[in-house]
Amino acid sequence: MAKRVQVVLNEDVLSLGRDGDMVEVAPGYARNFLLPYGKAVPVTPAVMKQVEHRRAKEAERQAALKQEALAFRTALDTIGRFTVKKQTGDDDVLFGTVTNGDVAEVIEEATKKEVDRRDITVPDIHRTGNYKVSVKLHSEVTAEINLEVVSY
């Protein structure tokens, strides 16, 4: 039975784990790859203390980001309705569609805060009217906004 060594990862390693994880690996893997390339360090009490400190700071940072996302969701709720103007043809059918990029621009104009278009989920919109759009602000915070599509 081969002896295993414990190391703490300094960065994400695809087959092992994420930054800060303590993992057991074969001694040769640690000695020949992880340690020389700076991807891991051997486990010592000092390293464990650093890992705990880093995890606490990361938890604080995540809590602050969540609070910021909650405040932004409240701001979006107070605005109420966002309006997108699109060119239409007969029977209020849009030329094209409303994309998540269009919604991101409208939110940015109204709030002066940038929202990544990839975090916006827009239903298929091909007509004028009112729609519900989902905006992911944080991994645990999602806002539902009212989107009004009008012709110009």
UniProtKB/Swiss-Prot annotation:
GO terms of biological process kind: translation
Keywords on record: Ribonucleoprotein, Ribosomal protein, RNA-binding, rRNA-binding
Q: List the GO molecular function terms.
A: rRNA binding; structural constituent of ribosome
* Cited function: Binds to the 23S rRNA.
UniProt-listed SUPFAM superfamilies: L9 N-domain-like (SSF55658), Ribosomal protein L9 C-domain (SSF55653)
> What is the protein name given in its UniProt record?
Large ribosomal subunit protein bL9
Entry GO terms, CC: ribonucleoprotein complex; ribosome
List the InterPro entries: Ribosomal_bL9, Ribosomal_bL9/RNase_H1_N, Ribosomal_bL9_bac/chp, Ribosomal_bL9_C, Ribosomal_bL9_C_sf, Ribosomal_bL9_N, Ribosomal_bL9_N_sf
| Sequence similarity | Belongs to the bacterial ribosomal protein bL9 family.
